[in-house]
Amino acid sequence: MPFVVMITGIPGVGKSTITRLALRKARAKFRLVNFGDLMFEEAVRAGLVEHRDEMRKLNPNVQKELQMKAARRIVEMAKTEPILIDTHATIRTPVGYLLGFPKEVIEVINPNFIVIIEATPSEILGRRLRDLKRDRDVETEEQIQRHQDLNRAAAVSYAMHSNALIKIIENHEDKGLEEAVHELVEVLDLAVGEYD
């Protein structure tokens, strides 16, 4: 039976780092798939963008088409191995927030778990300011909190259309990265035996 875990969090929350470390410790051997990378590959193929950070500026209807193409690719992969999707539940665009997974897309992927990584707005802002490699929009702490609140609401919506369980993992500076990694490993190890 396919086992798919979606891991989400707004930019700067530490999602990719936690994911990478948890995959090393988990007993279940997941294939890590970055949903944005799959969408980006489709967008480049169509001549729509040259750089990944241009994706969020695309027309929302075009983004939805790219989402569906990426979802179908994930379903094929999940037939043979457990999949961990590194993604964003919502994407801030110039005209508003876009759901990372409209109803049709989440129904195609049908994840078992939706994991949300969170931190305080001040921690996220600090991490973003230290990460000079990415072209990120500047947001206030209030906007960052609003984005995290929207992610929670989106996760509930996704769970309604997929029966996924929701797990919230906090990645605070004082809590330690190790605890957040441990919590994700516990979720991933539920896939042990699903592909035997």
Swiss-Prot record:
GO cellular component term of the entry, any: cytoplasm
GO molecular function ontology, one term from the record: ATP binding
Enzyme Commission number, as recorded: 2.7.4.3
UniProt binding sites for ATP: 9-17
Keyword check for Protein biosynthesis: no
UniProt keyword annotations, A-Z: ATP-binding, Cytoplasm, Kinase, Nucleotide-binding, Transferase
SUPFAM superfamilies, A to Z: P-loop containing nucleoside triphosphate hydrolases
This protein's record includes keyword Hydrolase: no
Reactions catalysed according to its record: AMP + ATP = 2 ADP
Compartment list: Cytoplasm
A Pfam family that the UniProt record links to this protein: AAA_17
Class of this enzyme: transferase
Sequence similarity: Belongs to the archaeal adenylate kinase family.
Name of the featured protein: Adenylate kinase
Gene name of the encoded protein: adkA
